[in-house]
Regions:
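C-terminal secondary-structure termini that scaffold catalytic or DNA-interacting sites
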Residues: 1-3, 185, 230-254, 260, ...
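N-terminal DNA-binding module of tyrosine recombinases/phage integrases
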Residues: 8-110, 260-282, 286-289, 358, ...
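Catalytic-site neighborhood detector that most strongly recognizes the C-terminal catalytic loop/helix
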Residues: 32, 166, 174, 227-230, ...
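Hydrophobic (often cysteine-bearing) scaffold residues that line and stabilize catalytic clefts
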Residues: 60, 76-79, 83, 104, ...
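Short, basic (Lys/Arg/His-rich) helix/loop patches that form interaction surfaces
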Residues: 121-125, 182-193, 202, 248, ...
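Short, polar N-cap/turn motifs at the start of nucleic acid-interacting alpha helices
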Residues: 215-221, 332-352
């Protein structure tokens, strides 16, 4: 290379050194030497074009604070809260004091290694692959913004995602139609009954069930237009996960059950001097106030316990998964199931929610068996 830049072998990486604004800048590069030379030429070109400047002294923690403030108005409250906790409790103590201009891929890779081996705050080992990827996603996004604003020359977290452990998706639990019926009977006289009914009958998410009002139900059609989320300061309504409302045609039995619940709820509220209206939440406390999402999550297992030790220990969110599985087993078209769930593509539905149960496997085996019988008969007839 020219005298303006040098490349030195450092272990299993290369150190690139070059001049920027009268100062020496360095970058650690992993890969082949010819690729390191290509990278150095690109850096020198950026310097010549004036696109680079002396590395900023702003620390990573200071930048994350600014970045999170910019993101607050554009991000769901619960997501912003999770980002803030990752920045403050995971990234900050480890590499938060490193200036942005000195944050290298090698330093971030070391941080990721520490996350995997001793990242838990309680000192009991490393973080899960999913949490490690949450940290990487946040860091990559924040540093990408810094690079676009020319605070740093490039995003040092860009190429590190491939080094993180893969997330192994567990088999999702699901109830079959018979089990779903038993669960509905168990919760019928409780305040969480309509939430369970909407999750099973319409495939709604937890927050969507808790945000639905009587004004959203017209005949047998429920408009899913918002969600109720839990934040550090309380609860808040927000748009659905995919950002737009959807219309779900309810099974007639589900719609009838909701109308019966509406009468019961009106009587409950009247005893407290409260008048039911179109804005009244379908799933609410006895005084008409919103149910806390976490309260629903914690209350739900109590009813499962009443169904005996052999009953599947599903989470509330698994009722949505059960809804899709039951619909698929009943022969409902995959695209229609996807639309009811509010997914952007059929692939998401097939990958995450459509879980073949034992009955479906047995039916598939029978169809294959019947096909082989036809083949055997055809061969016999030809003989």
């Amino acid at each position: 290379m020219s005298g303006r830049g040098t490349i030195r072998k450092r272990g299993n990486a290369f150190e690139l050194r070059y001049q920027v604004g009268g100062k020496t800048a360095t970058e650690t590069f992993r890969g082949e030497r010819r690729d390191a030379e290509k990278r150095l030429r690109a850096l020198l070109k950026l310097v010549d074009e004036g696109a680079s400047k002396a590395p900023t002294r702003e620390t990573l923690s200071a930048w994350l604070t600014r970045w999170l403030a910019d993101k607050k108005a554009k991000t769901a409250a619960s997501t912003h809260q999770r980002y803030s906790e990752i920045a403050e409790k995971t990234i900050g103590p480890a590499i938060g004091d490193v200036p942005l201009g000195k944050l290298t891929p090698d330093r971030i890779a070391e941080f990721y290694t520490d996350l995997a081996t001793k990242g838990r705050r309680d000192g009991k080992g490393g973080l899960s692959p999913r949490t490690q990827r949450h940290v990487h996603r946040l860091l990559r996004s924040a540093l990408g913004t810094a690079a676009r604003r020319e605070l740093i020359m490039r995003n040092p977290a860009d190429e590190l995602g491939a080094e993180l452990p893969k997330i192994i998706k567990p088999d999702l639990a699901a109830l079959n139609a018979s089990q779903a019926g038993k669960l509905l009977a168990a919760v019928e006289h409780s305040q969480i009954y309509p939430a369970v009914l909407l999750a099973l009958g319409a495939g709604l998410r937890r927050g969507e069930t808790l945000a639905a009002s009587w004004g959203d139900l017209r005949g047998d059609v429920l408009t899913v237009r918002r969600s109720l989320g839990q934040t550090r300061t309380g609860i808040a309504f927000k748009t659905p996960k995919n950002g737009r409302p959807r219309h779900v045609v309810l099974p007639s039995d589900v719609a009838d059950a909701l109308r019966a619940w509406k009468v019961r709820q009106a009587q409950q509220l009247l005893q407290l001097g409260i008048r039911q209206s179109a804005e009244t939440l379908i799933c609410a406390r006895m005084d008409g106030e919103p149910l806390q999402p976490q309260s629903l999550t914690h209350e739900f297992p109590r009813f499962l316990a009443r169904l005996g030790a052999d009953f599947p220990r599903v989470r509330f969110h698994d009722l949505r998964h059960s809804s899709a599985t039951i619909a698929l087993a009943a022969g409902v078209d995959l695209k229609l199931v996807s639309e009811r769930l509010g997914h952007t593509t059929i692939a998401i539905t097939a990958d995450l929610y459509l879980h073949p149960d034992q009955t479906m496997h047995e039916a598939a085996a029978q169809k294959i068996n019947d096909a082989f019988r036809l083949v055997a008969k055809s061969v016999a007839n030809q003989g």
